[in-house]
């Protein structure tokens, strides 16, 4: 069960999240962050893609070649769907304080991941009522908003990718290509992502989209050093 949701980033942007201004990106941008800025973690050059391995390749001229061939497969309509990502705190990632409230208690491995994958992050937005936050997002965007936990599997798991594609199509979802944005390579497992994907919208570049946060949605922003210091001595 999800206890908390966290967003790591620069303080000025985390304060915007606190006020309901969510920074959505897209698959093209996430690929570029790794390929151009060389930040693997925040970025992923295989975002929304899978690698299909074949042993027989037929070219357009009809010629046939035998061997081992890796083909990178992606769904172009998913490239510009808006994506908003969060870190998920389960019970194993938390503790209860003296008032019975859940507070983050991340492992050293996860702390290291945050520092390595999000090198510009100096703050964290802590969402203490995930259910209310999720509901607020759904109220704003309606049925076109797909949300849930990311599935982690090898990028080469094309069978799983294709099965998910068939499931999404059979379910009759609007913009069923969104499913490809809920799969990531096992390298990213520690990110424990919860994602919102707007399957009926497109954005050319990352942009802020505002929602109304209702009274039950409490978001606190802390400096990252303070956030990590609060966990010391509490294990």
Model-derived features with residue positions:
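NAD-dependent ADP-ribosyltransferases
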Residues: 1-235
